[in-house]
Amino acid sequence: MPVRRHILEDLHRSLGATFGEFAGWSVPMSYEGTLKEHMAVRREAGIFDISHMGRMIVSGEGATELLERIYTKRVSKTKVGFMSGPTLALNEYARVKDDEMPYRLGEEEWLIVPNAAVADAMLEYFSSIASSMGLNVSIRDLRERYALLALQGPGAARVMEEMGGGDLLDLKPLQFRENAGIAGVTAYIVSRSGWTGEDGFEIIAEVEAAKRIFKAAVEAGAKPAGIAARDTLRIEAGFVLGGHEYGEDPLRWPCAVSLRYGLGAIDWGKKGFVGEAALRACRREGVRWIRVGLVMKKKYARMIPRSGYRLYVDDVDVGWVTSGTFSPVIGRGVAQAYIDSRYAYIGDTIEVDVRGKRGEARLQEFPLVPLGSRG
């Protein structure tokens, strides 16, 4: 399959972006360097183009019923004008297809933003489940028409105000507004949300409007940031990514209970969703693997735990790294990992095999760094 191109690619090339492939897309990986972009988001503000992610509208009688069948959270409790917060779509083995945050546009109208690697598959999956339930809902793909931007950081509100979006500063977390004016254009949707652990806004706008907004954000002081920085930021924050922390194959991936997603992603009082029986069995029987955070100890600060590296306690192989990076915030290697539940004690020391050398790390809860404004 040919590599897909971002609908704002020309803009990013004009800003000096370097490109790489991610989930079948040619994406801006960085502009001035991942370290600078990462710290800009932690200290002030950065703006990302995340248009490689999915965007689809599910509407019509039965749309909410469809989402209740697919998701582990009771999304029907979500108020119009708000996102549901994170929830999971499972397969019948209680493995995770995707983690998503549906936007409720109306009583029977939702905006879904699947992760890039599964956007096409989720479009087909929604249609398949709707058909099996006998629901005549409309499912529309918006990716060709609308871009998706993320303005993130403790200074995101300042940048938004300078762009003329001051009336959006009263948005609560996970609240959104339709037809919002920014930078002299109208955005389809602006939400108070993000995936970096910082304050911020996610903006869905038609292509030309999105170009205007991106440029205006940069002029107001937001640093253009690439996908590489978005990944290091989400690792620090403890946010998951398909193909790293979860996947559908039961021979490779632990069940969703092991993910310890938190944030109310699973409503244990809910019944009737795909994968429910397997999920309850997994919880009842207990899990072998637990997702935890790792922070390298000071002596081993420059050792970076990468995906696939093995973990040891007294020479016993007890798990593996799912995602890792060097944290510029604390100056140490950090990671997310799965560890045998018998050894998953926060605060304990574990060894990471980094290219044949062992380094000590501390097991830590998420987030792995302090979040919010910092100097």
UniProtKB/Swiss-Prot annotation:
<comment type="similarity">
    <text>Belongs to the GcvT family.</text>
</comment>
<protein>
    <recommendedName>
        <fullName>Probable aminomethyltransferase</fullName>
        <ecNumber>2.1.2.10</ecNumber>
    </recommendedName>
</protein>
<dbReference type="Pfam" id="PF01571">
    <property type="entry name" value="GCV_T"/>
</dbReference>
<comment type="subunit">
    <text>The glycine cleavage system is composed of four proteins: P, T, L and H.</text>
</comment>
<dbReference type="InterPro" id="IPR013977">
    <property type="entry name" value="GCST_C"/>
</dbReference>
<comment type="function">
    <text>The glycine cleavage system catalyzes the degradation of glycine.</text>
</comment>
<dbReference type="GO" id="GO:0008483">
    <property type="term" value="F:transaminase activity"/>
</dbReference>
<keyword id="KW-0032">Aminotransferase</keyword>
<dbReference type="InterPro" id="IPR028896">
    <property type="entry name" value="GcvT/YgfZ/DmdA"/>
</dbReference>
<dbReference type="GO" id="GO:0004047">
    <property type="term" value="F:aminomethyltransferase activity"/>
</dbReference>
<keyword id="KW-0808">Transferase</keyword>
<dbReference type="InterPro" id="IPR006223">
    <property type="entry name" value="GCS_T"/>
</dbReference>
<dbReference type="GO" id="GO:0005960">
    <property type="term" value="C:glycine cleavage complex"/>
</dbReference>
<dbReference type="InterPro" id="IPR029043">
    <property type="entry name" value="GcvT/YgfZ_C"/>
</dbReference>
<dbReference type="Pfam" id="PF08669">
    <property type="entry name" value="GCV_T_C"/>
</dbReference>
<dbReference type="InterPro" id="IPR027266">
    <property type="entry name" value="TrmE/GcvT_dom1"/>
</dbReference>
<dbReference type="InterPro" id="IPR006222">
    <property type="entry name" value="GCV_T_N"/>
</dbReference>
<dbReference type="InterPro" id="IPR022903">
    <property type="entry name" value="GCS_T_bac"/>
</dbReference>
<dbReference type="GO" id="GO:0019464">
    <property type="term" value="P:glycine decarboxylation via glycine cleavage system"/>
</dbReference>
